[in-house]
Each structure stands twice: as structure tokens, then as C-alpha cells.
Amino acid sequence: MTQEQKLPVVAFKRRQTLENSVFYMNSLLTFYAESKDTGGGFDVAEWLGKPGNEPPPHVHEHGHEFCYVLEGGIDAYVGSDVFRVAKGECLFIPQNAPHTFLIRSPRYRMLFFTQPAGLTKYMRAMAAEPALQLDLPKEGIPYSAADIQHAIDEGRKYGVRFLSPEEVKEQLPSYPGMASPEEPNP
């Protein structure tokens, strides 16, 4: 039993504030429920990004991910599948499924759930700083310019494994790479 599973779970209400938001890879990330809040059951967070803020191809070794799009749209690459996901639509990504996405709109906002909890611990470890505003940071370092070894090392601690170029070619055959799509689709 983990330390979080031993904590009492109590009802709560939360909204987006500077106190529960961070700048993460040139994006805004707001934590609504984390492991310590849910007895290790799940995480819920909101992510606001723009083209160029996408994560490298990766897998979540410890849990499932469910995303609900609040604004904009993406092309999600999950194994050999490609899903165009827009506002009002959702996407489920099972544990250990190789995945990433490309943002197809000027801004992209999603609510995501991970089960069991733990992914937000990785995101906190990678966060550049507390949010200074409840919008995209004016400046920041996206994954493409980040210290990738640090991301790999932190990911290992929290069950996030980044794929090698060879694994990407084999496991995400339709993924075009980190270039932005030619035709944004709001």
C-alpha cells in the first residue's frame, strides 16, 4: 500500500487558480485531482498548449489515459491508429500504448484523466515554474528544446518511457515527426 493510499480521501471542490497551475513545457497545466487527493486512484488535470508544445512519442507504463478536448483539436497517434480529435470529443489511450499527438489549431485545451494516479508527479517534476498567469506562458522551453536526458530520467521514475527513433518508426508508423501539420484545423 502506498503512502497516498493510506491517506483519508475526502470530498473537495476545486477550480483553476495560480496555486494549482504550473508552466510545463511551454504550456499551462492545472492540477484538479492528484494521487494525494484520490488515494492513488486517479489524476485529473487540464492542459493548454499550442503547436510545438507536443510531447515526444512515449508510453505510460503504469496506467491508462483519457482525454476530453475543450478547445481546438489534435491528430493523435496511438500505435498504428490516427485519431482526429476535436472540441467535445474524447480519446482513450490504454496503458503501454505508444502515443503522441500534433496540435491542429492555434490553441489546444484538454482535460485529461490518468488511472491509477501518478502521471501528474512526472509533470510536476518537469514543470519549469509556478504559473504566473492562467494562459500560455510568454516564454518557455518546449520538449523539442528541453534537456531530453532529464525528461527520460524523470520519466523513468514515474512510468513514462520515451520511444527511440527506431521504436517510433515501428510502433507509430503514421507519425510524421515533431513538425506541425500543414493545415491547422480549428
What annotation goes with each model-predicted range?
Residues 26-32:
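Short glycine/threonine/proline-enriched tight-turn/helix- or strand-capping micro-motif at secondary-structure
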Residues 67:
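Structured binding elements
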Residues 1-25, 37-42, 51-63, 73, ...:
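Jelly-roll (double-stranded beta-helix
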